[in-house]
Amino acid sequence: MAVKERVGVVVSDKMDKTVVVAIEDRTAHPKYGKIVVRTKRYKAHDEDNRAKTGDRVRIQETRPLSRTKRWTVAEILESVGA
């Protein structure tokens, strides 16, 4: 089975080895057709604390690492500081 991957923006890096990644999903409303933007936030494991707030990252699903953490940072796509 394929590994689930998502691309999103880091919105918080205040925890040790953990970042909060916001994933934006744009879908059409089933009845009215208007594009609705829904945001979901995932906690992701960042072993080296490399990701900073504002970075675009790719996260991968993994085994449960804590009560709320089931994703890990696979790579940093765009860094805000660089």
UniProtKB/Swiss-Prot annotation:
The keyword Transferase does not apply. GO terms for molecular function: rRNA binding; structural constituent of ribosome. SUPFAM superfamilies: Nucleic acid-binding proteins. One of its GO terms (biological process) is translation. Keywords: Ribonucleoprotein, Ribosomal protein, RNA-binding, rRNA-binding. InterPro entries: NA-bd_OB-fold, Ribosomal_uS17, Ribosomal_uS17_bact/chlr, Ribosomal_uS17_CS. GO terms for cellular component: cytosolic small ribosomal subunit. It comes from the Bacteria. The keyword Coiled coil does not apply. CDD domains: Ribosomal_uS17. NCBIfam families: PRK05610.1, uS17_bact. Belongs to the universal ribosomal protein uS17 family. One of the primary rRNA binding proteins, it binds specifically to the 5'-end of 16S ribosomal RNA. Part of the 30S ribosomal subunit. This is Small ribosomal subunit protein uS17. It comes from Synechococcus elongatus (strain ATCC 33912 / PCC 7942 / FACHB-805) (Anacystis nidulans R2). The gene is rpsQ.
